[in-house]
Amino acid sequence: DYIKQMDKDLVSEISYESQINMNILREDEDGKVSILDTSTINLSSYPKDNGQETYLEKNYELLYGYYPTNKNEVVLIVDEKNRLDTNILNALGIDVKKNKEIKFDDLIGKEYKIILNDEFYKKQNGHFYVDSSEKNLKKLYNSKNTITISITAILRAKEDSNLSNLPEGISYSNELCNYYIDDCRKSDIVKSQQDSNYNVITGQTLKNSKNKEDEIFEISGINILNNVNQSTTKNQMLSSLGASLLPSSITIYPKDFESKSDIIEYLDNYN
């Protein structure tokens, strides 16, 4: 609410981003399908485009491939020395051998499948579960209802950028993020979780969701990170199911340099 009350003459646009858990499958060269460990690949979303130059074009150098042209194209962020943690590469299905240099061409075009909640989770005896058998994962991977995403660009943060705060790993558009969240909110497992005070997967009782939410803002340039202490609550469970209720970051685009100073002053007065 505090952000929304800001003088609109200072701001050209405000972008809300959410970090969510996605159901993603990968297929290895031998045809084996497995669930991708999204916590390992540092999944993140980048802000919506603002003006003619996109967020990625303005803040990240294109090393290989091309900037995304639609919501199903994702990017791979590397560090200032073009390096990437081997755990990320392994999770993405890239064969990593000791002291072996990975070519950009090995990464561009890699495809993964996002599985929507109603196909991923099955209900039995009042609880939900994931059938992770090889046969079912293969069936899910080949389903016509999947969202196919592909890596189209290798990017590195520009040295002079104040807003290049994406972690090394896979980053997807805010458009894809919102599409996924909207679908998750309509899914059976999320509706069931909203109506239950226990974890609909494990059956464990959830902690009180009415605890005061402590918001912490950190300013990086004009980017604000919003971390909410949710403990093990219903909100946290819903977020893990893709139905994010709160943004993980808010990016404010000032109209000009003077407006930026006024915005920072306004944010400094929070609390």
Located regions from the model:
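Basic-flanked hydrophobic alpha-helices used for secretion and membrane insertion
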Residues: 1-271
